[in-house]
């Protein structure tokens, strides 16, 4: 078993997930990266990095956890970053749209944490980061309404994990960013990228949250690139 802490990160091939992986690697973490098409990142040390072919829409969380444990013997943190957005209003959308987003944004991270719950508890300070969204705190527009339904649920999921694991040393945080300079954001807004939060900045936030002690628990962490009434 490795003596270094081990983090499982979903959606790790690009954007926020890749930035988080890079940040944690620089801090000495061992990584298990969930990717639809596994490719070893340039910054990664192969001996300290496990790649798992993983698509949140298809499941396979229990197998991923099993493979990571077989490779490294422990799991200290889960970063549930994989997510999708279908930009439709609650009126225009079909059930299939909602089902697709719930499958990736809510059900998949729940299954991943469920599968890793015992090894997280075994560390005495397991950490769970649910990448939610400011859309999990307010509904900003008509076309974000359906997405917001799933992100409100993702925030609730994080709170549920926190309640279930707190006595075991598990701490869960819902990280709620606004626009981040990623492919997803570029596809839905004409906001200049230089005015968005950078993935590397969000990675700094996640690393800070994971590094806090058990007596400094943060339930939610909102990050905005613009002035809003509450964020």
Where are these regions (language model features)?
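Rossmann-fold cofactor-recognition segment
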Residues: 46-59
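C-terminal helical subdomain
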Residues: 167-170, 174, 191-231
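Active-site helix of classical SDR
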Residues: 113, 150
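Conserved glycine-rich Rossmann-like NAD(P)H-binding loop of the short-chain dehydrogenase/reductase
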Residues: 27-43
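Residue(s) in the substrate-gating loop at a strand-loop-helix junction
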Residues: 133
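Conserved glycine-rich cofactor-binding loop
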Residues: 13-14
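Substrate-binding pocket helix/loop in short-chain dehydrogenase/reductase
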Residues: 89-90, 97-102
């Amino acid at each position: 078993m490795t003596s270094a802490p081990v983090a499982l990160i979903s959606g790790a091939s690009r954007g926020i997930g890749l930035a988080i992986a890079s940040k944690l690697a620089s801090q000495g973490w061992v990584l298990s990266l969930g990717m639809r098409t596994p490719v070893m990142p340039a910054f990664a040390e192969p001996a300290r990095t496990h790649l798992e072919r993983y698509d949140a829409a298809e499941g396979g969380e229990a197998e991923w956890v099993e493979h990571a444990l077989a490779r490294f013997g422990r799991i200290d943190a889960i970063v549930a970053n994989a997510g999708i957005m279908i930009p439709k209003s609650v009126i225009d959308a079909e059930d299939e749209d909602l089902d697709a987003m719930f499958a990736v944004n809510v059900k998949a991270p729940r299954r991943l944490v469920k599968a890793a719950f015992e090894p997280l508890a075994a560390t005495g300070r397991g950490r769970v980061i649910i990448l939610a969204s400011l859309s999990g705190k307010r509904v900003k527009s008509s076309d974000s309404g359906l997405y917001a339904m799933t992100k409100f649920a993702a925030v609730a999921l994080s709170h549920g994990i926190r309640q279930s694991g707190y006595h075991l040393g598990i701490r869960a945080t819902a990280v709620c960013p606004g626009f981040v300079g990623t492919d997803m954001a570029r596809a839905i807004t004409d906001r200049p990228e230089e005015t968005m939060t950078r993935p590397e900045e969000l990675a700094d936030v996640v690393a800070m949250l994971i590094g806090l002690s058990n007596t400094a628990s943060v339930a939610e962490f909102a990050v905005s690139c613009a002035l809003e009434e509450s964020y």
